[in-house]
């Protein structure tokens, strides 16, 4: 041993435990303590490790990473022993150790870590053995040359398999590693002499060997020609690189709209590596590949210093510490990877070989065969090239550059499975289609997950068709069943609709508890009655079925029979029960399918639905499954017809309890028992023509039950498996009160605010309003665009605040998820209650249960996570009830807080300059503008400045074409907003009930007077010294408008109409000359106008008398005989003759009932020349107005000679002289004690 130590020994190693030491005495003491009991010689355990010797000592520039890969001698080689010139040159230039001193197995450990790095791709290795087997260093494996790999050891097979699964590292240019001197062949020197040329584009070419496939071919940039180009490239290199390039392949849009509301992706993204120009279809594969170039190894072993760039490799490594291995069933081979075991069985035991088509050689894997064909055969040959293309598709590298095409729409897909699923889109029917929204799925599991997203199923009470939202249900009723009885049909349909959410789901038990309790009690009562009548004999049951139910909630159960003998003996899942109301004459010609939803229990369908055959006389009796939990009630066609014929005329045929239901006898929750209630629809259907008997008919679906049940759609299978709650109108109103009344037509989701609703609808319509200015990205919301710009086009990185953690990301949500790793709370593990699989994060187990175990309830998930979990977003955002009243507000919203402050009398936002206080921060900000003289908002069109942004926005409307759309009918004033016009109309009013006590200011509303006090008399107390309430006669004379319901007084008809609509919900409608008050169900901006035409009589006097009588009827219409205010009601304006003589009636025109604020065109009836001065005066005025005045101008003509008429106002409307507008103002009799002369006023 001393002799061995004398020969330039640098380090000693313990062979048993791989312990190294430069001192031999330390190892001797170690062996004596640890390994003496093993009975081995010390010289055999301690071995010296000598440094590598070099044949060229003067050359000091050689580094330790240049090794000779020793060829393994396994006997006489087969075939030619001729070696390629490249291999000979490389072997000559690689330093070889002395032949008399063979390398020890672990001698690479004596080298520094920097020497265990590949000089070509800069990849580092932990020992010399791995470096020798690296693909950049190895010259040629003798086993591959021989074409046989069956004699290799298992360890070598594992390493080779590992190399097959790992992507090959790219070759770095020599210019990046100038400190290393390498002696390589001239061919490889030319390959590595320059950097990789950047990819400038990607070309898609049709694959020659595979039809329907496209190959991605990257196009590299050409060599630089001028110095300017070089300078540009150099400046571009200074910009930090992402490491990859992203390319978007535009997808061909669909020619026809898809059945689903969601559109397919418009782009297909692929990626290329900037270091080695490899093409990747998936970004996660690219990110794992980039870690090879960046030497990033984020996955570290907690028990040793091992680190890897791929998480799967770390999982394999951890099995070294846990001892978990995969064992071969045929031999004693064990390995850490399941894939390695599979390769071992194929190579060693199954003897699977890859044969060359052009020679007799065989290879153990496809990669070696491809290498052989490229080296030994001509790749330019057509047959060789086709064989290479076919073999490349069997490798991961070959599939990486392949896309799959749809031959119909030319859309492209990244894998063949997606393409095959897409082909179903072009078929007549989707294999897994949602019947509510038209969404199509290619897998049953995907359809099942999709249907669970629909909170409600709305069912038409007439045709039993299902809809996803009440909007589509209402539209369907209008278009198909007519709008005559729309309200009744819609109400009945709501009562037969269902909620698909289970208890504890998205519906609040607190908010909807009362309604849900009523529904559950109703179902419980129905279930008890059904079970009682089910146990009765068939004859008694038929007799009882003819009786009227004693209570509204009681629904007698019908007789039950089995549809067919095949259904009796075959176990089948529950099917759709169908009910149609038709006439007996159309019994065989009209069949409308309708579906009842049945609750599918967890019990076996064979036990629940299968029954032994019964004789015909026993089929009318019910089949009660005493041991099962599900009782299915089926109504036969013959019995339903017979029962209806016997009871016809006594009661409604559908109101006799002939309902179909599925009752769960063992279910403690009676609300889960569902029923169909067509009784409510019986009154909604029109009577049958011809007096035929109306019966309940069951179509052929139940007559041929086995065929129908076997052909049940996937959607109905999913729907039958879900728990349901039947809805009613009160529950529906309660839900909308909690979640909002804005309903999405496409998915049925509810919203409170219009802005949120509009944003959500764009997710269905795919309307992108926000576009990125730096790329082709577009988004639905502004926040998504902002997030995109931060992540993609900015260098902002958010770093983890934890000490010692270098994690950084541009996405704040990813940072929040990362921070959970450092918290002790989230380090707990969660176990799945079904498969007992463990997860480290709560989001992972929730996603796992949702995907694999959708039947698990929310309460079970809440128990697993230790906190309450709810399904969010299915219906919408919940509202919270005010603790002081019954109003609902958005949860955690500012409206709720302000509302509570209003109850408590709190105004937290106070002005620091005065005593003003408010509950809104925005109101305080607007108030502070009064104390400031600075105007910071500038109009860019006229230069005018304003204090607030809202005022500037209103001002800019004046510069638009249709900005001033509110026009005064008295003068030429126009306003951009309606409140401004209402404020302007105050100056045209003679009676103003609000008056200032300190000046002559008066107004029509209290708000204007308060504003006047704040601006003109800020130190005075508000006081109204107006006349207040006056008598009806005084109000009529002064032109004021007094509400006939309450005591409020208004000076304008606009304020009066708004008061009626807001306070009393009323509007005035003239019907046949009789003014009536009606409830204002709809309040449009402009009241409707009704027309009353008085035809000219044979004698002119009769026509004049009829017109005057119609006017007088309006003045005295109340039963008490009191005169009504002519402007308080909707006055019937008439154009009557202005003279008492008979010839004055020749100018009689249409009589029009005009609502306040409307514009009506009256066409002149006659053009005869009247002799009355008054008539001539009006006609001349009309002619003058039509010629000289423009649109919306008017003239006021007054005459003191006409009794009962004070003023006539003529408006022009267009260029034709025969079209004008006339307002007639009656002359008011002056009050005796108060003779005030009133000016002409327009109504």
Swiss-Prot record:
Xref: Pfam families: zf-C2H2 (PF00096), zf-H2C2_5 (PF13909)
Biased composition (Polar residues): 638-650
Any one GO CC term of the record: cytosol
Zinc finger (C2H2-type): 12-35, 116-141, 271-293, 299-321, 326-349, 354-377, 404-426, 432-454, 458-481, 742-764, 770-793, 798-822, 830-853, 880-903, 909-931, 937-959, 966-988, 994-1017, 1041-1064
A single BP term in Gene Ontology: regulation of DNA-templated transcription
UniProt-annotated binding residues for Zn(2+) 2: 301, 304, 317, 321
Keyword Zinc-finger: yes
Key words, A-Z: Cytoplasm, DNA-binding, Metal-binding, Nucleus, Repeat, Transcription, Transcription regulation, Zinc, Zinc-finger
UniProt binding sites for Zn(2+) 4: 356, 359, 372, 377
Annotated protein name in UniProt: Zinc finger protein ZFAT
Species: Homo sapiens
Gene (UniProt): ZFAT
